Design a protein with these regions (language model features):
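Short beta-strand/loop motif that positions the catalytic acidic residue
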Residues: 227, 233-235, 239
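Catalytic active-site module of serine/aspartate enzymes centered on a nucleophile-bearing elbow/loop
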Residues: 260-313
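Catalytic nucleophile-loop/oxyanion-hole region of alpha/beta-hydrolase
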Residues: 70-105
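Conserved alpha/beta-hydrolase "acid-adjacent" motif
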Residues: 240-246
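Alpha/beta-hydrolase-fold enzymes
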Residues: 111, 118, 122-205
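Short, surface-exposed "cap/lid" segments of acyl-processing enzymes
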Residues: 12-70
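Active-site nucleophile elbow and catalytic-triad environment of alpha/beta-hydrolase enzymes
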Residues: 16-19, 205-223
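Catalytic histidine neighborhood in serine/cysteine hydrolases
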Residues: 58-60, 247-248, 252-270
Length: 313
């Protein structure tokens, strides 16, 4: 990641017709998945279609507030707006799960995982399980620039309004083919064009948005003991943005007695689209099946230890 300094001309919001991925199926639970910061529902597409086709689950992948809008609009997003956006989507999914009389499983990638943990703590009676995919509590991956450590200081200065990280290879992906497609798209992007994102997300990350993410993370850490439902954690050993420390921290601090930690060997941060996306989808499907069995009374809570073998199961 490289740092770019610029004043991005404000532009009005645009009408977003693509509100996310919404798949119908008659299965035994409702699944809601949330994308990451500056990402899009597209990064969850493979997992969503797998769960619909293999698990026969209805899947909801909403677009978080201001994602898909011009960069100047996205940069003004507060952490409260992000959480309220997730909560609004959650309420819709909860209503559907109640209407179907089936459990609700929620999950997310990176920021999406943080939001889902917060929802699970606030609505313990409504969340049957949480899947955390590359959860982000610490930006400590091997590709995070040293200047990222200055964000806590920049949060108290006007500098945060003019600083942007430009996304660089590997873009959170070990898959070289997909990485090449993203590079071709991002190379066409200029920070001063201030255009809306493509289905591949934004080429620039507003530092101000990272500052807001810090506030979400601090709140998420505080509520971890209140998360009592089953939790699945999946992370890559070589995650370029967030090290395995993130999943281990959650594993060690959540209140749930049913928790499982899966480590992947051939992926980077965006595990939902990378080389082991099929493995991730299979683990999430199995997790949903376990949640359904627990509700039916045929499977009691089991505490799972963190083992590398899980990744190859």
């Amino acid at each position: 990641m490289a740092v770019e300094w610029a004043w991005v001309k404000p532009v009005p919001p645009v009408d977003i017709t693509d509100c996310g991925i919404f798949l119908e199926a008659p299965g035994g639970c409702v699944v809601m998945l949330l994308h990451g910061l500056t990402g899009s529902p597209t990064e969850l597409g493979y997992i969503a279609y797998h769960l619909q086709y293999r698990g026969r689950y209805p899947v909801r992948c909403p677009r978080l507030v201001n994602h898909g809008q011009p960069l100047s609009v996205l940069a003004q997003t507060s952490w409260q707006q992000l959480y309220d956006s997730a909560k609004e989507a959650f309420m819709d999914a909860r209503q559907e799960s109640r209407a179907r009389n089936v459990p609700l499983v929620i999950g997310g990638l990176s920021l999406g995982a943080v939001l889902c943990l917060m929802l699970a703590a606030e609505f313990p009676e409504d969340v049957a399980g949480v899947a955390c995919l590359s959860p982000t509590l610490f930006y400590d991956g091997w590709n995070v620039p040293w200047v990222h450590k200055l964000i806590p200081l920049m949060d108290f200065t006007p500098l945060k309004y003019f600083a942007y990280f430009r996304e660089d290879e590997p873009f959170g992906l070990r898959d070289e083919v997909l990485r090449g497609k993203i590079a071709a798209q991002y190379n066409k992007s200029s920070i001063h064009e201030s255009g809306h994102s493509s289905s591949l997300g934004y080429a620039h990350f507003p530092v101000r948005l990272f500052c807001e993410m810090r506030h979400l993370i601090s709140r998420c850490k505080r509520i971890l003991p209140d998360v009592a439902c089953p939790v699945l954690l999946v992370q890559a050993e070589h995650d370029d943005m967030t090290s395995p420390r993130n999943s281990q921290y959650i594993f060690d601090h959540i209140g749930s007695t049913w928790r499982e930690l899966v480590m992947l060997k051939e992926s980077y941060h965006v595990i939902t689209a990378d080389l082991e996306r099929a493995t991730v989808a299979a683990h999430l499907q199995r997790f949903c099946e376990s949640v359904i069995e627990m509700r039916d009374g045929s499977l009691g809570p089991v505490a799972e230890d963190a083992t590398e073998a899980e990744a190859n199961a």
